[in-house]
Amino acid sequence: VGLNVAADPLFSISYTGVEGALVVVSADDPWMWSSQNEQDNRWYGLHAYVLTIEPTGPQDALEAAKLALEYSSKLKRPVLLRSTTRISHTRAPQRLGRIDLEKLKPSGKFHHDPSRWTLIPQYARRHKLRLVEYWEELQESIHDFPLNGVEGVRGSGLAIVGVGIGYRYAREAVKKLGLEDQVLIVRVSTSVPLPRKLAEDALEEGLVLVVEEGDPIVETQLKAYALEVGSKALIFGKRDGLLPLHGELRVEVVAAALARIAGLEYEEVRGGEDLGLELPPRPPVMCPGCLYRPIFYSLKRVASRLRVRPVYAGDIGCYSLGILPPFQVQDIILEMGGSIGSANGLAHVLDISREPVIAIIGDSTFYHSGITPLLNAVYNGAPLLAIVLDNHTTAMTGHQPHPGTGRRADGHEAPRIDPEQIVKGLGVEVYSVDAFDIRGLEETLANALSKVLKERKPVVVVARGACILVALSEARRKGLRITPYRVVEGRCKGCGVCYNLFACPAISRRRDGKAEIDPALCTGCGVCTQVCPFNAISPVEHVDPEWHKIMRTAKPR
């Protein structure tokens, strides 16, 4: 979904063309394993007239990346390289080659050519005409792309168009059904635009099955071309329901569709005998020691104390797990930056004295797309509380740096921009608080929310602490020993606050209702000592003060 944010320049660059090479890599997510929707970004290829390449496997992904750079440089146009989940998550041995970077390097000079680079109407109109001509030529010539091809038997009367990873599924399905000498397989790695020569190869067989992940984009192009040339071929795929319009494909699903077209009997392989047993539920949880847990715990307590039922506008990050019990502090999760944006509208229509609006957003997401909606909140006077969860990194996707980390993607130091600087610059009152300090959190959140309710204006709280995974890594690097915590047997009353309300994964309930801490899971954050009403939790031994410093300040290296 990241290409949505870059769509505006993509359309414009398609008009102007590029110097050097520009390859946009888009990782689509069929079945939405980690995305909020299942969009197929090949539509951008059609919409913006951008050549779209789909690798069929790991080696192809390597070759496709090289070829994408070469074609972009040769055509002087942007190229979209599309991957899907199985391609992105597959490993295999690679045959490495050499990319001639010198050949791909731009000149390093800016060519003053306003008629090309300024998209005012009189120039943009000319660009569109050239773009349409380029697109027509590309449809005629792109069939010779090295990763395209035709294999199998011509004149068999049945063709499979395998697109990207769909080509691999198609080959396995053909083998499973024993149709190797009875089918023509058309391998399409340039899915947009569909090469006309490959389309003709498929249509000549009379029966065609299009296998592609995502939307029926190649299928739609093929059907349009068939109408254009008057072909009577029957084309099957997703539009007729033979293949599913949602989720990932599987060999079994493709084999069942192929068997149906070929008139074969085929029973899809099912799982083993149903023993009537269910695996124990394993819901995703925030890590032991995660700074989000004390924030959400404190937020719930403050809302209860002020006798309000907030509407929580969430965002994209590890903190999306706040939707789950016992916290349930995510009522809306739409897209990156959607928290403050949604809160803007809600704050104007809800009775905030009973249902105050609280936006929850991470630091990297705030820099990415949270600043503009906060500006709108100021401009439109939206009474909302925005909580920026600052863990000094982009945790969910692999600890990438951002403008608040003081480090660039190449590892070099960079100016560090605190969220508070930005918020103050927008004229918004901002509070900063230690995310591991329960008392400080509750006091700060209560003051901030009360100010929103009384003064009806936006207020921001920045809750700060390190991602526990980064902190643990830093501690190991420094040779620091992490001291776990334990339950003091005689003091625990079995109230359940630590394992039910605070819900630390390292703490469990014993048969007698008392708490028990697993030292293998405990990260030594010590927040449980603050939430226990009976002072029944303590460290196993002396805690090195350096650890508490690292917990609050560690950043990825």
Identify the role of each PLM range.
Residues 1-65, 71-74, 82-87, 107-108:
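Active-site cavity-forming subdomains of large catalytic enzyme subunits
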Residues 31-34, 323-462, 468-474:
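Thiamine diphosphate
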Residues 55-292, 435, 446-447, 455, ...:
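Flexible, low-complexity linker and terminal segments
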Residues 269-340, 349:
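Active-site diphosphate/adenylate-binding microenvironment
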Residues 1-3, 26-28, 54-59, 187-188, ...:
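Active-site nucleophile and cofactor-binding loops and adjacent substrate-binding regions
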Residues 1-4, 26-32, 58-59, 85-87, ...:
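Acidic, glycine-rich active-site loops and adjacent beta-strand->loop/helix elements
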Residues 23-27, 80-84, 161-162, 211-212, ...:
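Short beta-strand segments
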Residues 27, 46-54, 277-282, 320-333, ...:
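Glycine/charged-rich beta-loop-alpha catalytic/anionic-binding loops adjacent to active sites
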